[in-house]
Amino acid sequence: MTGSPPTLPPPPLLPRLVGIGSWAIFLALFLASAHFTNFSLQTLAQGIPDFFAFFGKMWPLDWRALPEIGQPLLETLQIAYLGTLFGGILAIPFIFLGSRNTTANPVVMWGVRGFLTLVRSVPDLLYAAICVGILSFGPLPGVVAIVIFTASVLAKLGSETVEAIDPGPLEALQAVGAGRIQQIVYGVVPQIAATMASYVLYIFEINVRASTVLGFVGAGGIGQLLRTYLSFFDYRSTAVLILIVFGVVLLIDAVSSYARSKLI
């Protein structure tokens, strides 16, 4: 017995329309972005010789710049360290006030979350520029900018970690009449301590990188020296500085990654 082969039913219309619409939006955003930013592969290709010529000016390296780099580099690390330390301390109350299972009032929770979102919407370089206008030039504006960045990011990550904990210990503490502070200290902190330490180490890595450019707006650190070298077209010293920063960041990244692998 023979007959026509069975045919599959056509796919639903709505998913197809959603797929076509998504690709259309993606293409429209790409074209609009390329147009308004003057993105051009031809211009990029024409700039490749200049790219290599620029890096060619960095050779041979001028190692006489090494004595000048030590102090600003140390200042950069100090900015990142202090900013991470004070930012971490400042984030603690926001972590618990912004977590659904540890805050006392939903209004407070949403208020804290909204405030943190608002703070995170401003980049750390802009905070540094604002702080330079208020506190004058030097590393202090850089520290303040890093504190604000660290507190806002750590509070966000921390509140999400708190909401993902096992509720059992909290419920047990509530059953025996423990207060909210006691619940946090004995029921929440032991569960999030390792993860939060890992976050702090990771944010310190980010802050070291961020601190290297804060000097461009006068907020201290090695960025000021980098700006000076570029202003005087001293590319050979610039190359030495970049190599030193690269090595330090790699070292911190390796140590931090090892420490975080032991924590989690």
Regions found by a protein language model. Give the residues of each.
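N-terminal, non-cleaved signal-anchor transmembrane helix
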Residues: 1-85, 92-93, 97, 101, ...
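Cytoplasmic-entry segments and transmembrane alpha-helices of multi-pass inner-membrane transporters
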Residues: 94-128, 157-160
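Generic hydrophobic transmembrane alpha-helix motif, especially the helices
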Residues: 116-150
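Glycine-rich helix-loop "coupling/hinge" segments at transmembrane-helix boundaries
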Residues: 133, 208-245, 264
